[in-house]
Amino acid sequence: MRQRTIVCPLIQNDGYYLLCKMADNRGVFPGQWALSGGGVEPGERIEEALRREVREELGEQLILSDITPWTFRDDIRVKTYADGRQEEIYMIYLIFDCVSANRDICINDEFQDYAWVKPEELALYDLNVATRHTLALKGLL
């Protein structure tokens, strides 16, 4: 089984949290709402990976003004690729508290939508199990 280290930003701006809706045909949680994030590449430092993933998935305009390591956990997930292939992966999640200076988002094709959500409305979204666990651990659910 392949192992991946995943950097995952919990991004907040003025009391609202960023959720991204996964594309229906790919990823670990197709069609569900999630936090952004992705894999650390070989030779890449953790914060570099976090900033790269934010740029790739959310666009160049989103500015993270504060990044603080928060927690970690692991899991085994089945990832679905755009071509329909599936793979079981051992995931190590490194989760960061992040504050953005703005809300300028330009999502890539991994996502079909995004939303800035008040804490009391987070439970209204179809959150994937990993995001639900993270938000509950943070005391937001």
Curated annotation (Swiss-Prot):
Catalyses which reaction(s): a ribonucleoside 5'-triphosphate + H2O = a ribonucleoside 5'-phosphate + diphosphate + H(+); a 2'-deoxyribonucleoside 5'-triphosphate + H2O = a 2'-deoxyribonucleoside 5'-phosphate + diphosphate + H(+); dUTP + H2O = dUMP + diphosphate + H(+); dTTP + H2O = dTMP + diphosphate + H(+)
Residue ranges of every copy of the Nudix hydrolase domain listed in the record: 1-141
Pfam families reported for this sequence: NUDIX
Cofactor: Mg(2+)
InterPro entries registered for this protein in UniProt: Nucleoside_triphosphatase_NudI (IPR023781), Nudix_hydrolase (IPR020476), NUDIX_hydrolase-like_dom_sf (IPR015797), NUDIX_hydrolase_CS (IPR020084), NUDIX_hydrolase_dom (IPR000086)
UniProt record similarity statement: Belongs to the Nudix hydrolase family. NudI subfamily.
PANTHER family: GDP-MANNOSE MANNOSYL HYDROLASE, MUTT_NUDIX FAMILY PROTEIN
Lineage: Bacteria, Pseudomonadati, Pseudomonadota, Gammaproteobacteria, Enterobacterales
Encoding gene per record: nudI
Keyword hit for tRNA-binding: no
Oligomeric and partner information: Monomer.
CDD domains on file: NUDIX_NudI
SUPFAM superfamilies reported in the protein's UniProt record: Nudix
Protein name per its UniProtKB record: Nucleoside triphosphatase NudI
